[in-house]
C-alpha cells in the first residue's frame, strides 16, 4: 500500500457540534407542539363539524370542479404561453411587441378584476359575431350572456391570465438553451420549427418545470376567486353550507384541508418531474474531510 493510499484510507469525517442550532431546534419544536395542542383542544375550531362535512357530497363535488378548472385553465394557459413565448423570440418585432403588451397587461391587472370583467363582457358586446372590421359582413354567433356563462368567463379569465405568466417562464427556458446547441442544429440543416421542437423545447423543460409546478399549485388556489361568480367550486360549496348552519370556521377548515391535500399531491408530482428532467445536471456533493494525525509510514 502506497503512502497516498494510506492517507486516503485514514481520512475521517468529523461533524462539528452546533449547540446553537440544537437549542433553536428544540425551542421551535416546543412552540410548534404548544400551537398544535392549542388547535386540537380549542372547542371553537369545531373539529366534530369538520369531520362531519369533510366528505360531504356538496364539498366533494366542489373539489372536483376545482380540479377541472385547474386542469383546463392550466392546459389552455400553457398552450397560449408557448405561442406568446415563441413570439418573443428575436426575429419579428411586431410579434414580439404584441406578445410583450399582452404580458404587460395581464400581469399588471388583478385576476379578480379580470374575472369580473369577463363575467360582464355583455355590457360591452351584447352580441358576439365574427366578420370583417369597419362594417364588413359578419356572422352572428349569439348573445354574449348565452355564450359566455359564468363558468366560461371563469375559464377565460384564468386561462388568459395564466398564459401571461407561462409565456415568461417558457421564454426564460428558451433563453437558457446554449447558443452552441442552436448552431449545431442549424449545421444539421434543421428548419426553425424543427429546431424548436427537437432542440430548444426539450432542453428548456429542465428550467421550465419547477416554476410551472408552482404555477399549477398557484392556479389551484387561485380558482377560489371564481366563487365571486357564483360557481360551485370548493370554496363556494363550503360557503353555501356555512350560510345555512353558521359554522364558518369549521367549514373553512374543511376547504383548507382539501386544498392542502391537493397541493401536496401536486408537489409530489412536481418533485418527480424535476428528478426526471434534472438527470445529469445534479451537482455533486462535496464532503469536507479532516486528515488523520496518524503518521504515514
Residue ranges and their predicted role:
Residues 1-297:
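Transmembrane alpha-helices and adjacent helix-loop boundaries
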Amino acid at each position: 500500500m502506497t503512502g497516498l493510499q494510506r492517507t486516503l484510507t485514514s481520512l475521517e469525517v468529523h461533524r462539528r457540534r452546533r449547540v446553537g442550532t440544537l437549542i433553536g431546534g428544540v425551542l421551535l419544536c416546543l412552540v410548534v407542539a404548544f400551537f398544535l395542542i392549542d388547535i386540537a383542544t380549542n372547542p371553537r375550531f369545531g373539529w366534530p363539524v369538520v369531520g362531519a362535512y369533510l366528505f360531504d357530497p356538496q364539498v366533494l363535488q366542489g373539489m372536483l370542479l376545482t380540479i377541472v378548472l385547474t386542469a383546463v385553465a392550466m392546459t389552455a394557459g400553457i398552450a397560449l404561453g408557448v405561442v406568446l413565448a415563441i413570439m418573443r423570440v428575436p426575429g419579428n418585432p411586431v410579434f414580439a411587441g404584441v406578445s410583450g403588451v399582452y404580458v404587460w397587461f395581464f400581469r399588471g391587472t388583478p385576476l379578480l378584476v379580470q374575472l369580473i370583467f369577463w363575467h360582464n363582457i355583455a355590457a360591452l358586446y351584447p352580441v358576439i359575431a365574427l366578420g370583417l372590421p369597419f362594417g364588413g359582413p359578419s356572422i352572428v354567433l349569439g348573445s354574449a350572456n348565452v355564450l359566455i356563462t359564468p363558468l366560461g368567463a371563469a375559464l377565460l379569465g384564468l386561462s388568459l391570465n395564466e398564459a401571461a405568466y407561462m409565456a415568461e417562464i417558457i421564454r426564460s427556458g428558451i433563453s437558457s438553451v446554449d447558443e452552441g446547441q442552436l448552431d449545431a442544429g442549424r449545421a444539421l440543416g434543421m428548419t426553425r420549427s424543427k429546431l424548436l421542437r427537437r432542440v430548444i423545447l426539450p432542453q428548456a423543460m429542465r428550467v421550465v418545470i419547477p416554476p410551472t409546478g408552482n404555477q399549477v399549485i398557484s392556479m389551484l388556489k387561485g380558482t377560489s376567486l371564481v366563487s365571486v361568480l357564483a360557481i360551485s367550486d370548493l370554496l363556494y360549496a363550503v360557503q353555501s353550507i356555512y350560510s345555512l348552519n353558521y359554522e364558518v370556521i369549521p367549514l373553512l377548515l374543511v376547504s383548507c384541508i382539501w386544498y392542502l391535500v391537493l397541493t401536496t399531491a401536486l408537489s409530489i408530482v412536481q418533485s418527480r418531474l424535476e428528478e426526471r428532467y434534472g438527470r445529469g445536471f445534479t451537482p455533486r456533493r462535496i464532503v469536507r474531510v479532516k486528515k488523520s494525525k496518524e503518521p504515514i509510514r
